[in-house]
């Protein structure tokens, strides 16, 4: 397959997407994200990959869902890069770990624990999963300027959702629980499932990537008997992502002059 041909999984070709791409996990969120674009057009959907393209500040931008977990997210990034994308902003949901992380807060990742295996196909375990600094700074600034309670720090990435939420069912429950205790003691902010893979794949490809998350809930606060509502409205994190993307577009234009 030639890199500029129709991509095997996302079914897109060169010209279908912009250089800037937002990466939610849920295909159902793509249309609502695209409504923040000017003149959004549905490019297509195959498997978990739902793709829309439009414009922000006159710049061509896209949104492509990745599904759940590292393998499908890595495929999306590789195929989007094949047809011209070079800046990726993941927006999704997470569960809080640190006790000060509340539902409806926004978390911006400064690094990701590689408690998954997709990234090992791209870099040895000694290599850190870290986002692009400029993308991360734009996400942090956008969250704060929009008035969201924005946390910045390390997130944990996993392959098994139920390994976190029902570890006692696993034959290796003791390992899962010990690791979880380590994450807590190390001040990890939240848990999700894609960023470690995306950060390492981005490094391997030489592209930019950053992540921000909407906090759904915090199981550690619940265990501690603290106030713990649940929040599934991701619109805040999406707005943060859109504003961060505008900042990046403006910054890139200024550097190009």
Report each predicted region and the residues it spans.
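Generic non-transmembrane alpha-helical segments
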Residues: 138-146, 201, 240-251
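Metabolite-binding pocket within alpha/beta catalytic cores that recognizes anionic/polar moieties
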Residues: 1-138
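Active-site rim beta-loop-alpha module in soluble metabolic enzymes
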Residues: 130-187
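Short acidic/polar active-site loop segments enriched in Thr and Asp
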Residues: 86-87, 189, 208
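His/Asp/Glu-rich mid-to-C-terminal helical/loop segments that flank catalytic regions of hydrolases
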Residues: 219-257
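Glycine-rich beta-alpha junction loops
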Residues: 27, 95, 156-162, 197, ...
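Flexible, glycine/charged-enriched surface loops at secondary-structure junctions
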Residues: 40-44, 147-154, 250-257
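Zn-dependent metallopeptidase/amidohydrolase metal-coordination segment
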Residues: 196-230
């Amino acid at each position: 397959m030639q890199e500029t041909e129709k991509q095997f999984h996302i079914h897109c070709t060169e010209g279908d997407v912009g250089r800037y791409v937002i990466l939610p996990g849920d295909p159902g969120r793509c249309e609502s994200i695209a409504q923040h674009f000017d003149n959004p057009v549905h490019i297509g959907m195959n498997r978990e990959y739902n793709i829309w393209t439009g414009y922000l500040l006159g710049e061509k931008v896209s949104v492509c869902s990745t599904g759940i977990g590292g393998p499908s997210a890595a495929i999306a990034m590789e195929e989007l890069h094949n047809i011209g994308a070079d800046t990726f902003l993941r927006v999704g949901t997470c569960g809080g770990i640190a006790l000060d992380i509340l539902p409806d807060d926004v978390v911006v990742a400064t690094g990701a624990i590689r408690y998954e295996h997709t990234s090992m196909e791209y870099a040895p375990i000694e290599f850190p999963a870290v986002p692009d600094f400029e993308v991360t700074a734009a996400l942090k600034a956008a969250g704060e300027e929009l008035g969201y309670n924005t946390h910045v720090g390390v997130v944990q990435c996993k392959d098994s959702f139920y390994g976190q939420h029902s570890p006692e069912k696993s034959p290796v429950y003791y390992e899962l629980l010990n690791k979880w205790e380590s994450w807590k003691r190390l001040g990890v902010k939240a848990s999700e499932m894609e960023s470690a893979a995306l950060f390492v794949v981005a490094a391997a490809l030489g592209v930019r990537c950053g992540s921000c998350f909407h906090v759904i809930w915090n199981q550690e606060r619940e265990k501690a008997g603290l106030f713990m509502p649940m929040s599934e409205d991701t619109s805040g994190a999406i707005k943060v992502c859109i504003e961060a993307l505008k900042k990046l577009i403006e910054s890139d234009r200024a550097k190009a002059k």
